[in-house]
Amino acid sequence: FFNFIIEQGCCPDGRQARQHNPFQERADLVKLKNPLLAVRDMERSKTFYREVLGLHVVMDFGANVTLTGGLCLQTLDTWTDFLGKEVEEIRFGANDSEVYFEEDDFDGFLAHLVGCADVVYVRPPLEHRWGQRVVRLYDPDRHIIEVGENMKSVCRRFRDQGMTPEQIAARMEVPLKFVTGCLR
């Protein structure tokens, strides 16, 4: 949600985001490319991401796999080698980060999860105070995966419930400009 606000260049209260960063003056900025998760069992992880989230292998180098959307999986033994660490120094299930996905058909996704045998929920699905519905679950290595309702879908759901754009903006705690953009 907040990434979308940042991409739109405005703060939650409607002001334009203003930050000076000397790196912005460079043409060769660093760019986030691929989040990477260390995994104990590559095949089990590929199966989970395919069956639960619908991601497919784009590139498979054996010890490193890139899935649709850019998520990378790395075998634990090669990851520890890259870091110069021991396996015991890698902590799975620390509950201190997540990988975030969005879904247009959130109700359909929840129905899909019911048919997935190995899904372990961090907590049941919930609706945040701004109206976005989310579900958090663990992957086989207990990395937290969040799937949230697409913000355009949230705006449209509220509109379909009879709310005006102004009411939606107030309910979601976002600028009216954000709401009107989502409703186009």
Located regions from the model:
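Conserved acetyl-CoA-binding loop of GNAT-fold acetyltransferases
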Residues: 51-58, 118-119, 174
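N-terminal beta-strand motif that seeds the catalytic metal site of vicinal oxygen chelate
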Residues: 10-44, 97-99, 150-184
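Vicinal oxygen chelate
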Residues: 40-42, 94-141, 161, 174-177, ...
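A contiguous, mid-protein "functional segment" used to position or interact
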Residues: 136-153
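Conserved short beta-strand elements that form part of the metal-binding/catalytic scaffold
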Residues: 14, 56-93, 144-149
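Extreme N-terminal basic, low-complexity initiation segments
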Residues: 1-9
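Amphipathic alpha-helical segments
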Residues: 41-55
